[in-house]
Amino acid sequence: MSGLLKFITCGSVDDGKSTLIGHILYDSKLLYADQEKALELDSKVGSRGGAIDYSLLLDGLMAEREQGITIDVAYRYFTTEKRSFIVADTPGHEEYTRNMAVGASFADLAVILVDAKQGVLVQTRRHARICALMGIRYFVFAVNKMDLVDYSEERFKEIVDQIQELSKELHLASVKIIPVSATEGDNVTTHSDNMPWYTQEPLLAYLENIDVSEKKQEEGFYMPVQRVCRPDHTFRGFQGPVSYTHLRAHETL
């Protein structure tokens, strides 16, 4: 499937969003040699005890690297042989939900991560609802950390039931559920030998092939507000990205 795919990664805290995208970039050979070397060096002092920490490819702020979390929205552009992508890697903490909502406002598809040990959590549900409210029609639920549940098909089916219940509640039409391990690479870019019971496409192949051309383009002015700016009591401004319109200076909205 040709054409640009804009998607968001979201979900609850520590579900592995940055690690997943970092592993896609790493496995797809989309890094320069100096980037790979820097990743190896940074991982030695990171939060994974010396093992390669793929999340460092997305976590750019010093505070993010020190704490092992995502705070801001990290946008990355990459291209495979089949498709070009822009991904918005968003934070999972509740206090940064507004940043997640801004990332969702630009996306055609949402990749929502679910921890295989914990299942669907409150923040998982919140992010799915926000994505639906933002008009996203295509959803991929990546059931991550399958290595921590011994790649159990039974556990995967339990979480599938939770996701299907959520999808029904939110009236989600297009839903794909894929079992993955972002740290180990299972079903991220290639099929997993650890999960022979899953015979469908791995995540990257699904993203390369899905057709999102039916997404309805909204008309008129559309600007998700990320921040209210009040330098003093005489002024109130709004900051955020502008989509689906063309503006001119001094134009009245």
Spell out what each predicted region is.
Residues 48, 59-69, 168-175, 208-221:
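Active-site phosphate-binding and catalytic loops of NTP-dependent enzymes
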Residues 246-253:
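Single conserved hydrophobic/aromatic residue that forms the stacking wall/gate
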Residues 6-10, 19-21, 25, 113, ...:
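Helix-rich terminal scaffold detector
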Residues 151-209:
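Canonical P-loop GTPase G-domain recognition
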Residues 2-98, 107, 142:
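P-loop NTPase switch module centered on the Walker A-proximal segment
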Residues 110-113, 136-146, 167-180:
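Conserved beta-strand/loop subsegment of P-loop NTPase cores
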Residues 231-240:
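Short, structured beta-strand/loop micro-motifs enriched in basic residues and often containing a Trp
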Residues 94, 106-125, 140, 147-154:
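Conserved Switch II/interswitch segment of TRAFAC-class P-loop GTPases
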